[in-house]
Design a protein with these regions (language model features):
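Ordered, amphipathic secondary-structure segments that act as subunit-interaction surfaces
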Residues: 61-113
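Active-site-flanking beta-strand signature of metal-NTP-handling nucleotidyl enzymes
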Residues: 2-8, 110-114
Length: 141
């Protein structure tokens, strides 16, 4: 059975690319002495997978990483130990057993909140409503 981490990627960490982030997690598990499952084959490596990779330069408070916990490390100890081994800007919030397949998370509905330092612009609401009312065309390629 797979396990999941809920983590945030903010500050300077938002400039870490997806592949570098995967390697960062693999190394952090080793530094934190948390045993995880490895891939099978001629060159086994720690198995980690990020549900929906972010583009470089974007930050997030709710990223999901899938891995396989081995040994007797309790779920409640993983966030603290792993955060201590991560670079600045990456914080592990929660570790838990996976309930659904990772591919199912790609079809989740998201709610986005935008904060404006000078209040919400008056023209924003009608513009957003017009955008949401547009019909979406599909192109076959």
């Amino acid at each position: 059975m797979a396990d999941r981490l809920l983590f945030s990627k903010t500050g300077r960490a938002k400039y870490i690319s997806h592949l570098d982030l995967m390697r960062t997690f693999q190394r952090a598990f080793a530094r934190a002495q948390i045993r995880i499952k490895h891939t099978e084959g001629f060159n086994p490596h720690p198995f980690v997978s990020i549900a929906l990779p972010l583009s470089v330069g974007y930050s997030s408070q709710c990223e999901i990483l899938e891995f396989g916990l081995m040994g007797d490390t309790p779920y409640d100890q993983v966030p603290q130990r792993l955060t201590a081994a991560m670079p600045e800007g990456i914080v592990i919030h929660q570790c838990y057993p996976a309930q659904r397949k990772l591919k199912e998370l790609a079809s989740i509905n998201y709610i986005m909140n935008f904060e404006y330092s000078e209040g919400r612009p008056q023209e924003a609401e009608p513009a957003m409503q017009a955008l949401l009312n547009q019909e979406i065309g599909r192109a076959h390629v």
